[in-house]
């Protein structure tokens, strides 16, 4: 059983929003996951498509005879990254803090187990 992994670090999207998209494709095979992400109208979907393609490319690099259609999304998880703090000027000389959240997304693909009969 072969696994390949791709990690996106410091991606400019909040982990809460990215988890909504990641939960949609967990467990699906590669082609079906790409189709789901293509028709998902969220900013995180394009980031996850890039990571999924990278994980498949990593798997093919490890085993060149591997068929990409025999892979599925074994694990996908989103962790909180650092928070960029910015300030917005407000009335009467005050300022409000703006927290721009970053996230780390990890995608693990694995081969679909073939049943021996």
UniProtKB/Swiss-Prot annotation:
GO biological process, one term: translation
GO molecular function, one term: structural constituent of ribosome
Pfam families, A to Z: Ribosomal_L22
Residue ranges the record marks as coiled coil: none
InterPro entries: Ribosomal_uL22, Ribosomal_uL22_bac/chlpt-type, Ribosomal_uL22_bac/org-type, Ribosomal_uL22_CS, Ribosomal_uL22_sf
GO-annotated cellular components: cytosolic large ribosomal subunit
Signal peptide limits: none
Keyword field: Ribonucleoprotein, Ribosomal protein, RNA-binding, rRNA-binding
Function: This protein binds specifically to 23S rRNA; its binding is stimulated by other ribosomal proteins, e.g. L4, L17, and L20. It is important during the early stages of 50S assembly. It makes multiple contacts with different domains of the 23S rRNA in the assembled 50S subunit and ribosome. The globular domain of the protein is located near the polypeptide exit tunnel on the outside of the subunit, while an extended beta-hairpin is found that lines the wall of the exit tunnel in the center of the 70S ribosome.
Record's subunit section: Part of the 50S ribosomal subunit.
NCBIfam families the record matches: rplV_bact
Record-stated family: Belongs to the universal ribosomal protein uL22 family.
The protein's name in its UniProt record: Large ribosomal subunit protein uL22
Species of provenance: Leptospira biflexa serovar Patoc (strain Patoc 1 / ATCC 23582 / Paris)
């Amino acid at each position: 059983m072969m696994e390949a992994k791709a990690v996106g670090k410091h991606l400019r999207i909040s982990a809460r929003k990215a988890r909504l998209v990641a939960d949609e494709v967990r467990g699906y095979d590669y082609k079906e996951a790409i189709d789901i992400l293509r028709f998902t109208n969220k900013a995180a979907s394009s980031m996850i498509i890039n990571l999924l393609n990278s994980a498949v490319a990593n798997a093919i690099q490890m085993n060149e005879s591997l068929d990409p259609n025999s892979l599925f999304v074994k694990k996908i998880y989103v962790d909180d990254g650092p928070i960029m703090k910015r300030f917005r000027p407000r009335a009467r000389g005050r300022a409000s803090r703006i927290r721009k959240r970053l996230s780390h997304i990890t995608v693990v693909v694995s081969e679909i187990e073939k049943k021996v009969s």
